[in-house]
Amino acid sequence: MLRIMVVSGLLLAVVMGLAAQPAFAETPDEVLASFKKEAAGTPGFQGFSATRGENFYKTRHGSDWSCSSCHTDNPAAQGKHAKSDKVIKPLAPSANSERFTDIKKVEKWFKRNCNDVLDRVCTVQEKGDFLTYVLTIKK
């Protein structure tokens, strides 16, 4: 009986430990790899560029905003929303380890922010270039 209780207790501890972990935690490199896989089917795709990503990040697009309007010129710095003044944690994974670790959140924020900045969704090329750039930023 004691043996059953010990085994049951250990099993419960393992299950609870697994439940506490994020279900699909990715690394930023894995998110980038998923963009690359998606982009591979695009005619003319030749890879992502940190230079294009930096230009995309800092350029004002269709509206008066750029990514840096809220996230600052330094993605490793804390930002502030241009309209609401809400504080935004650093964008660069080197300064904020939670960034780009959940593909669903990544896609949600790209959808929202691209619509705000570009008045359209971002292409996979733009997302890949952007992430390639942000991954070059050191704290």
Predicted feature residues:
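TPR/TPR-like alpha-solenoid helical repeat scaffolds
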Residues: K86-A92
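Short alpha-helix boundary/capping elements
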Residues: H61, P75, L135-K139
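The canonical Cys-X-X-Cys-His
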Residues: S63-P75, F130
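Short cysteine/histidine-rich zinc-coordinating motifs and their immediately flanking basic loops
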Residues: G79-K86
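Post-cleavage N-terminal segment of exported redox proteins
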Residues: L2-A50, S94-K139
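Short acidic alpha-helical/loop segments enriched in Asp/Glu that coordinate divalent cations
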Residues: T27, S68, A82
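Local sequence-structure signature of Cys/Sec-based thiol-disulfide redox active-site neighborhoods
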Residues: E54-W65
